[in-house]
From Swiss-Prot:
This is Isoflavone 4'-O-methyltransferase. 2-hydroxyisoflavanone 4'-O-methyltransferase involved in the biosynthesis of formononetin. Can use 2,7,4'-trihydroxyisoflavanone, (+)-6a-hydroxymaackiain or medicarpin as substrate, but not daidzein or (-)-6a-hydroxymaackiain. S-adenosyl-L-methionine binds at residues 209-212, 233-234, 253-254, 267. It catalyses: a 4'-hydroxyisoflavone + S-adenosyl-L-methionine = a 4'-methoxyisoflavone + S-adenosyl-L-homocysteine + H(+); (2R,3S)-2,4',7-trihydroxyisoflavanone + S-adenosyl-L-methionine = (2R,3S)-2,7-dihydroxy-4'-methoxyisoflavanone + S-adenosyl-L-homocysteine + H(+). It is an enzyme of class 2 (transferase). InterPro entries: COMT-like, O_MeTrfase_dom, Plant_O-MeTrfase_dimerisation, SAM-dependent_MTases_sf, WH-like_DNA-bd_sf, WH_DNA-bd_sf. Induction: Up-regulated by elicitor. It comes from the Eukaryota. The gene is HI4'OMT.
Amino acid sequence: MAFSTNGSEEIELYHAQIHLYKHVYNFVSSMALKSAMELGIADVIHNHGKPITLPELASALKLHPSKVGILYRFLRLLTHNGFFAKTTVPSQNGKDGEEEEETAYALTPPSKLLVKGKPTCLASIVRGALHPSSLDMWRSSEKWFKEDKELTLFESATGESFWDFLNKDSESGTLSMFQEAMAADSQMFKLALKECRHVFEGLESLVDVGGGTGGVTKLIHEEFPHLKCTVFDQPQVVGNLSGNENLKFVGGDMFKSIPPADAVLLKWVLHDWNDELSLKILKNSKEAISGKGKEGKVIIIDISIDEASGDRELTELQLDYDLVMLTMFNGKEREKKEWEKLISDAGFSSYKITPICGFKSLIEVFP
C-alpha cells in the first residue's frame, strides 16, 4: 500500500530521492549493456533474421538453463533503455488448433550499432569506455582532488599516463583496442561526409593529424580520389602501414611540426589536450597550410558544448565526454566561446561551426 501525502515538501523529497538513486545506479545500465555486447546478443538476433524468443536466444548463446530467467531480467532493463524492442511471434508450443503467441526481442537502432562486422559497429567503443582501466581510476578521485600535483586522475590512480599505459605492453591488446575504437568511431563520419562534401572540395592536399590507422582519411580518399592525403601520427602507430600514390603514412610529432598541405584535419585531437598544448598544435597547423595562402584551412572535428541547446541527452553526453577528457588526458571539451578564443590566440582570422555526427561539430578555421 502506497503512502499518500499532500505536502509539496514530501513530494519534492521523493522526486529528489528518485533522481539521486537513478544517477547512483546508472552504472548498472552501463554494465548490463557491456554484458550484452560481450555475450553477442545483438549478433545472435541479427543472424536470426527476425525477432527471437527468450528460449531461442538462451539456446543460441549456449547459456546454462539456470540463467534463462536472469537473461530475461537483463533484457527487461535493456529493452526499457531502448536497446531492444519487444514484440510477439506465434508460439511453437501452442496446442493443435489454438493460436498462441510469445514474447520475442528485436534489434533497435542503438543495438544495431553493436552488430559485429558492420561498418557502423561501435562494440569496441563500449569495450574501451568500460574497460577496467577507465573505471578503476574513479576510486582515487577524492585523493586526486586534494593533491597539489598537475596529474590527471588516471595518472594519480595508476602512476602512469594513459598514453604510456597504451604503449607499454603491445601484447596486452590495449593499444589495438584503442585504435579499433577510434576506427569504429571514424566510420560514423562516413555518414556525415555526404553532408559536408563542400568542406573538402577544391583541396589538392590534406594532412590528417593524429589520424591513427587512417580510418577517416581513407573515407575522404574514397570520396576524393584525386586528393593527396597524408596520415600523420606517432611513428609506432603508422610505422608498419602502407598506402598508395595519393595516400601515405608519415610518423612525427605534431608539437614540433606538421607536414605542409592545403588543409589540416584535426579529428578528435584537440580535446585530448589543454589550451596551452592545443594552441601549439593549432599554430603548427597554421604554419602547415601557409603555402596555400588565404585559401588554406584547418578542419577541426570535435565537440562544441551548447548548454542552451534544449537537448538534455545531447548536452549530458557532451559534458560526460568533457570529464572523460579531463580525468584521462587533462584535455577538455570546449564551448563556442572557448573555441573562439583558442582559434583567435592561434592567429586565425575566422571560423565556421557546423554540427555533424549527432553530438560533434565540424569547425572550419581560416588564416
